[in-house]
UniProtKB/Swiss-Prot annotation:
InterPro entries noted in UniProt: HATPase_C_sf (IPR036890), His_kinase_dom (IPR005467), Sensor_HK_TwoCompSys (IPR050482)
Annotated SMART domains: HATPase_c
Record's comment on post-translational modification: Autophosphorylated on His-241.
Membrane topology category: Multi-pass membrane protein
Protein name from the UniProt record: Sensor histidine kinase NarS
GO cellular component: plasma membrane
One of the Pfam families matching this protein, by short name: HATPase_c
Encoding gene, per UniProt annotation: narS
Covalent S-S links between cysteines: none
Subcellular location(s) per record: Cell membrane
Effect of residue 241 to Q: Complete loss of autophosphorylation
Positions where Phosphohistidine occurs in the chain: 241
Domain Histidine kinase: 224-425
GO MF annotations, alphabetized: protein histidine kinase activity; protein kinase activity
Amino acid sequence: MPSYGNLGRLGGRHEYGVLVAMTSSAELDRVRWAHQLRSYRIASVLRIGVVGLMVAAMVVGTSRSEWPQQIVLIGVYAVAALWALLLAYSASRRFFALRRFRSMGRLEPFAFTAVDVLILTGFQLLSTDGIYPLLIMILLPVLVGLDVSTRRAAVVLACTLVGFAVAVLGDPVMLRAIGWPETIFRFALYAFLCATALMVVRIEERHTRSVAGLSALRAELLAQTMTASEVLQRRIAEAIHDGPLQDVLAARQELIELDAVTPGDERVGRALAGLQSASERLRQATFELHPAVLEQVGLGPAVKQLAASTAQRSGIKISTDIDYPIRSGIDPIVFGVVRELLSNVVRHSGATTASVRLGITDEKCVLDVADDGVGVTGDTMARRLGEGHIGLASHRARVDAAGGVLVFLATPRGTHVCVELPLKR
């Protein structure tokens, strides 16, 4: 049996042959929301197809005398389907779509699923001896099967089954034509389809929990890696400050004293300039490894100093817009993200200008870092993570663990990264 480290010690369960950690509710909700948004979008597209099938069923399978009320019903459903489609894709960027989806909760998808049940059941009731409208109702379990909540799916499927029974029993022409044995068989077949859809939802729910568990484990491992890296950086910074930097400062002081005794020696002047440059570089290195200013005066000045030193070193024009007058427990996380993003701008973007904005909105720390370089997307970062580059991915994991979000936003040129974190005072 392989060892899973903290996962095994903290407790977990096997799902699909994988040991999954007992996932936090926040991580589970995050993954469930993402899956629910995906399912909601798929269902909104399928609804358009259902509208087309309803029109076809009306034309080939119902009497012309029933068309007026059916057209009205199909028209209402078409409007609802288009509305659902617009809501599902109203935000072109996944971040804002997901945030809107979180704010609306579970009511919107449930409401449209209820509309599906009512409209398709009504369509069958308006169709005398219509086998095709009855076949359209088979699509209901398919739409419900895209859900990720077993309880909600069970309620909807039960209502769907009742609607199917009402539609069949409410058509006396069909009852006389097929008789009770075939009616019972059709009901049993539909019940089987509903049960199958419920099992699919259950499997999807378990899959969601598995993904959430693995995501939480990955975040934990990345956070541990970052913590170890920060400890190492602090030790290196202290070693540089207490060792080489002090030696350089001492040597520079001796040269200053020598220059006072024997002024005018150009070699001494060049040595002093070199030692001055070396001491500044060492101070900058210790600042980036362990920013004392972050502990002394706060995140805002630390970010401003980091941007200024990065601009001076790289030649990139970096503007700052900082309105962050408080201190918070998330400050080290935010500073680490800024440091990593500016490092990526210098190393990979080829940008000539960049901007850093830091502020507070709705009790959240909001960070925006943008540049005019070659551009980086979330897919690019995922590929780099697969290649072993965990820098930004580890910071994203820490942001997620703190209840925040780090996303790449669409921009005509360059890269735009937005970070939101709830404040911890």
